[in-house]
């Protein structure tokens, strides 16, 4: 079959996205960056009737939600699980349906798996009651504490949804706002293994439990049981579906288009200088617009794109004091002659220490994920894709030899993986790895940060940069702004900005729908 004859959701089908036409001189809105936040805000604005340009510096759309191909294998560049998006009863799932996004989703069950230093493991069911029953069977002496903990998690989930996703103040959130996951676990439990189990997926935050918000962790914890999904065809299919919808609404998506400067005058943004074209034929163009939305790295926006005279030095200093989330080392492996059952056995987080606060050092060996267990077409017939992920607490600026740094991490990962998979070398068909610098090179995220600013209590809410910029007509979407990092918060930031620009709540549904979303599907 020819590539052009493949269905749109096939992971091997090329993405014919991005007009080859250069940007026009004027738009109603220009979005800098085609990550998920940039794509969603572009769709919402185009749907509202605005003339919109999305300028993306990479040659594909999606940011961290993209894929690449090697020898017939398709690999997710970074993001590989998508809570809520396949559930039409949730805020983001309903939005995708309302926008006509055709992506199909595979529900992941089990949600996750944890391997402990004592050789035992725990599998997280997608059913909340089953999950809690297994916890109580494993830790009967903590049964009462588990009930108390999850009662609190439900309450915090609801309050956090109202505050961080609906911008509604509540005095009932105050006792929890400054609390870390570590503090909550220590308050409820004594058993160190149970504490690790309940923090065992903390690497997805890119921060240790002692610096991770209990509120945000509670929101993600319960979202798993409303549905954790993988896109049919892989991450790029989801990004491409968004991009195609944007173009169908009349939007102009321009790839290989780097935002160089945001033009400002008298405290307002009025345009963007964009560099377009192939590497040896780059051209800088000025594009005028009523509204500018940055989906890029916030410090780069301040340092490289805005005139220092147009920003408050104290505000910029506050941004500089924020801590980015940890970067992640990734190894993408195309394999043959390995059974799905073996991959199921070894998938999940592998912990070598009971100290989850050392997650970015030596406590976490790695996480193993196999997308072909959900979407077999990511590999040639008979093949499997395996992704190794390891968060790293590191001094990015002092790495002097990135190739050697990456090679050392890759060798260590393979040595440890060989202890789990016999004859590993024989089974590997192709391998590609990515360091923090790789993540930076393709996405321009500060130091390769996984999720923008760290989701610590002091960096959420008023402690996180708001979606409105330091000058009029400038807005931010994505994980460097409110409400935070992760696929749902990123989409919520886009919904918020679209609402502000169009001066209409229609961008996120009717008031009645918003009320339902505030209490959507909290597990009983």
Locate the predicted segments by residue:
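Mid-domain catalytic core of redox enzymes
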Residues: 260-380, 518
